[in-house]
């Protein structure tokens, strides 16, 4: 994308990868977006976000909004985020290792139709991810043989919490069609009903 963008500005949401696994500015992006609520905070107790840019003009405008509009984190959220970043590398290594194990396990289950995780060699983005990332992250999607099966998986898990967030130390599962993407109904962004999203935590697997 960076090679063919022309005069367009490229902004990459790097929330799933974090700066530990991928650095979009070094790959040609103009700006990078992070939800610090997720992996950077890492403990499901922060609300925040960050924009990183190499563009001095954009940086100046962002500083203006921060100073005049108040687009800054609360002191306590800033403290929690700084605390979380101290363990980012250790946590991300564990997220990646656990996700790889879970993806490979699920891929061998007859109940599962498809596992979408870039750490699997049959994933269409595996080669690219291996080239530009230092790990494959902790997020995956799993497709089952029916929408009802997917819903029942979400409603009957005993070790994984049913919740919309991601990037915390605990594993979370959700049904995007009826949760995170419910507002996308009627658009091209509607996920398949048989799809489940899992945020793999740092538990002992």
Range-by-range predicted roles:
Residues 57-60, 162-177:
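Mobile, glycine-enriched helix-loop/loop "lid" segments at the mouths of ligand-binding/catalytic clefts
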Residues 100-158, 162-164, 181-187:
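Conserved small-domain helix->loop->beta segment predominantly found in fold-type I
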Residues 81-90, 137-145, 196-201:
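Short, well-ordered beta-strand elements within core beta-sheets of diverse protein domains
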Residues 91, 155, 171-205:
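PLP-dependent enzyme catalytic core of the Aspartate aminotransferase-like
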Residues 42-43, 73-75, 132-134, 188-192:
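Short, flexible turn/loop "capping" segments at secondary-structure junctions
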Residues 1-111, 116, 122:
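Conserved PLP-enzyme active-site core in the AAT-like
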Residues 16, 38, 87, 102, ...:
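Glycine-rich beta-alpha junction loops
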């Amino acid at each position: 994308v960076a090679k063919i963008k022309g005069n367009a500005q490229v902004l990459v949401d790097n929330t799933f990868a974090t700066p530990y696994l991928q650095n979009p500015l070094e790959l040609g992006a103009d700006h990078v977006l992070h939800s610090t609520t997720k992996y950077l905070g890492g403990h499901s107790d922060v609300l925040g976000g960050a924009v990183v840019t190499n563009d001095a003009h954009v940086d100046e405008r962002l500083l203006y909004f921060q100073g005049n509009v108040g687009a800054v984190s609360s002191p306590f959220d800033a403290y929690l985020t700084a605390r979380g970043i101290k363990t980012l590398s250790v946590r991300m290594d564990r997220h990646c290792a656990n996700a790889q194990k879970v993806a490979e396990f699920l891929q061998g289950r007859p109940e599962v139709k498809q596992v979408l995780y870039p750490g699997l060699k049959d994933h269409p983005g595996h080669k690219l991810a291996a080239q530009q990332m230092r790990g494959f992250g902790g997020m995956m999607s799993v497709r089952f043989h029916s929408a009802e099966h997917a819903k029942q998986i979400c409603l009957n898990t005993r070790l994984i919490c049913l919740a919309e967030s991601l990037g915390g130390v605990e594993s979370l599962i959700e049904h995007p069609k009826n949760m995170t993407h419910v507002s996308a109904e009627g658009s091209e962004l509607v996920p398949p009903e048989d799809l489940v999203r899992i945020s793999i935590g740092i538990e002992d697997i």
